[in-house]
Amino acid sequence: MLIFAPAKINLTLDILGKRPDGYHELWSVMQAITLGDLVEIEPAEGINLRVVGADLPVDSTNIAFKAVQALRAATGKAIGASITIRKKIPLEAGLAGGSADGAAVLYGLNKLYNLNLSQEELLEIGAKISADIPFCLTGGTALVQGIGEKVKKLPPLKKGYFVIYKPPFGISTKEAYLRLAGKDLTKEHPDREKILKALGKENLEDLGKFLKNLLEISALEINPEIYKYKNELLNLKPLGVLMSGSGSALFALTENLKKAKEIYYQLTLPGQKFIVRPYAAGPTCLKL
């Protein structure tokens, strides 16, 4: 089975506070995009994982490997798989590359082994592996709350293009959250009502105005180059620019492909860049 595993961006990321268990309560609008990994899964005796296109571990520290183990634990069945991941999503970017792969494995094995697990059951299993897996399983446009386990589908964003720019460095998610500790974020919170209204009307101009990610504050402290790169993108006059997740990837929102191409070709910073569109689904089976 060949599965497309879409990446995600955060159109907004608000942090409401830290829970007693150390996790942070979030309020985030996430969007799946047409950039993604290809995950090939075949039934097997044990767990055999191969990654092409990135230097990643292929043992139990890999989220895709953990997904097989989690399904075994949840079902009590000796599920095995031979998995090949062809990486397209940049690493340490805030684009949920690992979680996208984990979601694809849960989705694929549920079908391959006829486990008949409901979407709700898959979300519950996924949440125990990674905070982004519940959204990655859902895809499209969604409001994500809690620590990532509460996912509410929103009307899909059908308009617009995004130019994704990944600098030649990553940002540690753990450090990004740690840097927020003790900061007064009272005036930093996004306008939730306005971003939901802009999305509901598919008003891209307003959406661009209200893009907000609190983790940008700490990312700028960790690596001030982010500020320079963001300004470079803003100078190219998109509708808005934001860092996705804990970074380091930035995205520029545009109203059409012509403007997206203009930004893409004028952007001469070191790193990776992509033109993508909103994607209305989660993991998608391309071939049985």
Swiss-Prot record:
InterPro entries: GHMP_kinase_C_dom, GHMP_kinase_C_sf, GHMP_kinase_N_dom, IspE, Ribosomal_Su5_D2-typ_SF, Ribsml_uS5_D2-typ_fold_subgr. ATP binds at residues 90-100. It holds the Pfam family GHMP_kinases_N. Its EC number is 2.7.1.148. One of its GO terms (biological process) is isopentenyl diphosphate biosynthetic process, methylerythritol 4-phosphate pathway. One of its GO terms (molecular function) is ATP binding. Keywords: ATP-binding, Isoprene biosynthesis, Kinase, Nucleotide-binding, Transferase. It catalyses: 4-CDP-2-C-methyl-D-erythritol + ATP = 4-CDP-2-C-methyl-D-erythritol 2-phosphate + ADP + H(+). The active site is at residues 8, 132. Gene3D superfamilies: 3.30.230.10, GHMP kinase, C-terminal domain (3.30.70.890). HAMAP family: IspE. Belongs to the GHMP kinase family. IspE subfamily. Catalyzes the phosphorylation of the position 2 hydroxy group of 4-diphosphocytidyl-2C-methyl-D-erythritol. This is 4-diphosphocytidyl-2-C-methyl-D-erythritol kinase. The gene is ispE.
